[in-house]
Amino acid sequence: MKLTSLVRKLADRVTRRFGYRLVPQSLLDLYQIESEISLETKRLEMGSIAGAAVYLRRDNPRLLELRTLYAGLDPALKTPLLWTEEFVSRTDILNFRGHNGWVWQWRNPGLDELAYHLAAYYVLARDQLGLMEKLSEDGTFGALAYDIAGHWVSRDLLDSILEIGFLDRHLNIATCPPLSVLDIGAGYGRLAHRMLTAIPSLGNYLCADAIPESSFVCEYYLRFRGLEGRFTVVPATEIDWALNLTRADLAMNIHSFSECSLSAVEWWLDRLAAHGVKHFMIVPNACGHDGELLRNIDGEDMQPLIERSGYRLVVKEPKYSDPGVQKFALNPTWFWLFERSGGA
């Protein structure tokens, strides 16, 4: 017992230097000690998706083709802060909707089960478009889902409903003439899937990325969801060509610029300015400031670059309008909407 006590004291002394304390497990709430195994059981029971394991392979010719294409990227895009070759090589492309760099779903602060419950009830109370009834979660490809108030919910679903609601409040996207959308850093196609499903009248949806694996799974996933013909996967090497063909009314960057170097951010902003994209929505990572600042994970400020590109801030609001919910609910951040000065 004395040896155990000594070890605990020594360990506590070490962890204190890094801002942590050792406490007895008996003092923790259940959600704080929930194990990886118990979280895994909360995933929806799904059979294997026919053909997924055969197609979603790193030696797939389509992925190899995209890698060759992306090798010609502008050098400004080749200094990622997070999505390095090593990081990408460790990402599970079969379970691309699981807990990974595309959508963090647990372990991190603000991603415990209570945060999911609080976010779900908040969405149910403020869902002006009725998207909790129009959209659903089936747990495919590894998505972590909880059964809350009669709905299977995931971070994919809840974040998407809140983002679509924000855009509708300020740009009336559900009722305005069909928009053409550019999704920068579209990942596996999370928001593309949700927006195209929620708003059938939505015009062409461009999914752009600088990571070949993202474009690969995005293309597969949106086809899997039956959205063929309503989206275009655009490699960063072809973005100017795509925007010359289809002018984008709205550009979005959701949790992507936060993981980019300033040179990469500036490269994308130059594209938006050159092609006259009128509105630009950005959602930053929390990065220690809960998304109230537009900084990347290195702490560099992106807002001056955005403003120098001719965009002015028109709306900035918390993801959850209630301060208590914003503090404790799922992955709190802020939503920013910019408009191109003098743009039409």
Task: Map each language-model feature to its residues.
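Conserved class I S-adenosyl-L-methionine
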Residues: C176-G187
